[in-house]
């Protein structure tokens, strides 16, 4: 939804059930200007949904039913009609996980760039299957715990984590660290920033996704400008934290990304 609100022509490929919840999803996406004709409908399973349990501090527990979402199959991925400048992949679970490589290879075949915010299913793939696919990724976004798990490098050894990730991913790697901010590397330069201070802390649901989509949107708006992408991603995440739910606070084209101030972004060269 971030891409559409920021003015990019956006479509989504997904699977929903033939139910009231699925129809509401379609209406919401259409209202935001997202093309929905590539969304498949499963006649046997309900649409995915989540129940979010919030604490007074804004932390939360999320109970998720994946439903039709995890049943996306090759027949639901219309390769002959999918052409874009960018593909943005998030968690593919269940049967849908089998499409991970298919989507990456299709994106490269049509000359698109690919951003991936992986889920547990992708992170748990056997190394010999995952590493060739990482070579197809232009922007890889994950949190520090996930980065430590994937690389098998202790959480505290940030430099070693990035050395491995940079050797696997030819493009940009962004590792978020909650209150610790974010570090981004393109293999030769590393950028680090803290976080923007929200005016009110309501709900952290969707903050990570908001950073990821905001970061990639920044690269669409200003190609190659990583500091701008970090600022936009951080502002988008901060805005989402100030609202209930994962969608309400997503920034639009006219929203200032400097509302919470300008991030101090540190830059340093790193050896290959």
Task: Give the location of each predicted region.
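Conserved phosphate-binding/catalytic region of the ribokinase-like
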Residues: 155-272
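Structural detector of well-ordered beta-strand residues that form the stable sheet scaffold
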Residues: 11, 88, 114-115, 174
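Active-site-adjacent beta->alpha loops and helix N-cap segments on the catalytic face
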Residues: 96-103
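Gly/Ala-rich phosphate-binding loop of Rossmann-like dinucleotide-binding domains
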Residues: 4-5, 220
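Conserved N-terminal subdomain of the carbohydrate kinase-like
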Residues: 5-89, 256-272
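Conserved phosphate/ATP/ADP-binding segment of small-molecule kinases
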Residues: 104-105, 110-113, 119-192
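Short, conserved phosphate/pyrophosphate- and ester-handling motifs at nucleotide-, phospho-/glycolipid
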Residues: 3, 143, 208
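Active-site glycine-rich loop that binds ribose-phosphate moieties when present
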Residues: 69-77, 98, 123-128
């Amino acid at each position: 939804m971030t891409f559409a609100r920021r003015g990019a022509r956006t479509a989504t490929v997904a699977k929903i059930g033939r139910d009231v919840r699925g129809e509401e999803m379609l209406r919401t996406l259409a209202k935001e200007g997202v093309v929905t004709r590539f969304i498949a409908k499963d006649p046997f399973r309900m649409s995915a949904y989540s129940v979010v349990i919030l604490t007074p501090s804004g932390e939360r527990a999320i109970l998720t039913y994946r439903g039709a979402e995890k049943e996306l199959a090759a027949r639901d991925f219309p390769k002959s009609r999918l052409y874009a400048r960018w593909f943005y992949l998030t968690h593919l679970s269940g049967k849908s996980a089998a499409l991970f490589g298919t989507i990456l290879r299709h994106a490269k075949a049509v000359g698109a760039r690919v951003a991936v915010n992986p889920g547990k299913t992708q992170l748990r793939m056997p190394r010999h299957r995952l590493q060739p696919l990482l070579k197809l990724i232009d922007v890889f976004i994950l949190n520090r715990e996930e980065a430590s798990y994937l690389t098998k490098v202790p959480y505290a050894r940030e430099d070693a984590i990035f050395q491995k990730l940079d050797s696997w991913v030819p493009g940009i790697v962004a590792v978020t660290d909650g209150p610790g901010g974010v570090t981004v590397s393109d293999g030769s330069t590393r950028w680090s920033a803290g976080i923007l201070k929200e005016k009110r802390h309501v709900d952290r649901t969707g903050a990570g996704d908001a950073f990821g989509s905001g970061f990639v949107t920044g690269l669409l708006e200003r190609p190659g400008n990583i500091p701008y992408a970090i600022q936009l991603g951080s502002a988008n995440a901060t805005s989402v934290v100030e609202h209930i739910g994962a969608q309400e606070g997503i920034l639009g084209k006219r929203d200032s990304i400097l509302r919470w101030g300008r991030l101090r972004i540190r830059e340093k060269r790193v050896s290959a």
